[in-house]
């Protein structure tokens, strides 16, 4: 009887802690997630996912349309780690101002997950603010070739598919080529948050979009590596649009394969 009561007490305690924990969020919290229509270009919104973890959301005009773009903010002691710029100098300056207003901790380091302007545009603003900017050697090289802003410091140990390195409160993972040959994903172990960047699509997206620098053949395999490496992820943030769960990975694979099949037929 005593053992039975002890087990029951442990179960009840764990249940109460799970309910009370700030990390016990629901993936359906994306219903409150800021959307493109709510964010004027030049402004930034922050969305708290868990204790010490936020996404940042900005919008940008491109080819006559306005698109949302996500990034990540993770607390690292009394400092903040920023993942990706807010797509441009004006947006990134607004991001730093919003962080100061809402969080009140300094951003000391920033990682760009690939070389496109929605990830590195604004690096110069960060550098001027005293933020140490990082990217893989591949991203830095491709950004230079593209004429984009170049993060200052190189992240080593991310050259081969499946490589992972710890960087403060997060793990950086190179799944292989997908949206671009250099794209990284970021995992926050303390909150089971996976930031997929542009390698992952939101559920409402049905077209592959910009695949000029993509490796369509390798993309599904790279997503499979992400799934295998982070099966415990609960909250998945795409590069653009609304977050969800691990179902975003399967959805992205389906969209990419459909695009590839159409291209073959055409």
From Swiss-Prot:
Its EC number is 3.5.2.6. One of its GO terms (cellular component) is periplasmic space. Its cofactor is Zn(2+). It is found in: Periplasm. Residues 1-20 form the signal peptide. Zn(2+) 1 binds at residues 114, 116. Changing residue 65 to W: Modest decrease in catalytic efficiency about 8-fold, with respect to ampicillin, and increase in catalytic efficiency about 9-fold, with respect to cefuroxime. Zn(2+) 2 binds at residue 198. One of its GO terms (biological process) is response to antibiotic. SMART domains: Lactamase_B (SM00849). Its main location: periplasm. It comes from the Bacteria. It is an enzyme of class 3 (hydrolase). Inhibited by chelating agents such as EDTA. Inhibited by a fungal natural product, aspergillomarasmine A (AMA). Inhibited by 2-triazolylthioacetamides. Keywords: Antibiotic resistance, Hydrolase, Metal-binding, Periplasm, Signal, Zinc. It catalyses: a beta-lactam + H2O = a substituted beta-amino acid. Pfam families: Lactamase_B. The class B beta-lactamase family has a specific amino-acid numbering system known as BBL, for standard numbering of class B beta-lactamases. A multiple sequence alignment was used to derive a consensus sequence and then the consensus was numbered taking into account insertions and deletions. This allows use of identical numbers, e.g. for active site residues, despite differences in protein length. UniProt always uses natural numbering of residues, hence there appear to be differences in numbering between this entry and some papers. NCBIfam families: bla_class_B_core, bla_subclass_B1, blaVIM. Belongs to the metallo-beta-lactamase superfamily. Class-B beta-lactamase family. Monomer. Class B beta-lactamase which confers resistance to the beta-lactam antibiotics, including penicillins, cephalosporins and carbapenems. Acts via hydrolysis of the beta-lactam ring. Has penicillin-, cephalosporin- and carbapenem-hydrolyzing activities. PANTHER family: ACYL-COENZYME A THIOESTERASE MBLAC2, METALLO-BETA-LACTAMASE DOMAIN-CONTAINING. This is Metallo-beta-lactamase VIM-2. It comes from Escherichia coli.
